Amino acid sequence: MKSIYFKILILAFMASSLYSYAWGLTGHRVIADIAENHLSRKARREIKKMMGRERLAYWANWPDFIKSDTTGAWKQASSWHYVNIDPQTDFKAFEQNLKAQAGPSLYTQVNTLSSQIKDKNTSEKDRKIALIFLIHIMGDLAQPLHVGRAEDLGGNKINVTYFGEKTNLHSVWDGKLVDSQNTATQNILSF
């Protein structure tokens, strides 16, 4: 059964990426807040039933936090945070490349997670986890270095100096841009 509120959630996340300049902790929370601010009443009710009283921003970083889990319980989700593409690829070649890749990616998981959330036969716990991941990976999908070349590991192999600090391009884009502004989340949301 297709539900309009999930379509609205996905559209809100996609729209939020237009206003997002970085992702890290602050960026993921801001993206989730922007998406939540654009939900219909029906979508908001349905998500509240599933998630409880916490805002979407509360859960937005959980998929990054569990990457450090040493039990291996979430190992299969590590590839959900990015997709490798050749920058000279058109969409048709991109789709063929995805089919040739082993395992899921950020791009393929959007549909998989959306289907799990909509499937009433999926347990409430699994639907909640799918929504938490969807909240997070929609932000990752909008971050240019999570959709890029495998050779530079999403900018992790590109060394830069940012305000006198040696770091890498991914780190700058993922958090330092927003965090260095010392701007309250509320101010970011008003852009």
Which residues are covered by each model-predicted region?
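Bacterial N-terminal signal peptides that target proteins for export
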Residues: 1-8
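N-terminal signal peptide c-region/cleavage motif recognized by signal peptidases
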Residues: 17-19
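N-terminal, motif-rich segments that launch catalysis or mediate targeting to/interaction with membranes
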Residues: 21-137, 144-191
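Sec-dependent N-terminal signal peptides of Gram-positive bacterial secreted proteins and lipoproteins
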Residues: 13-14
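Residue-level micro-sites within transmembrane alpha helices that shape
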Residues: 6, 139-142
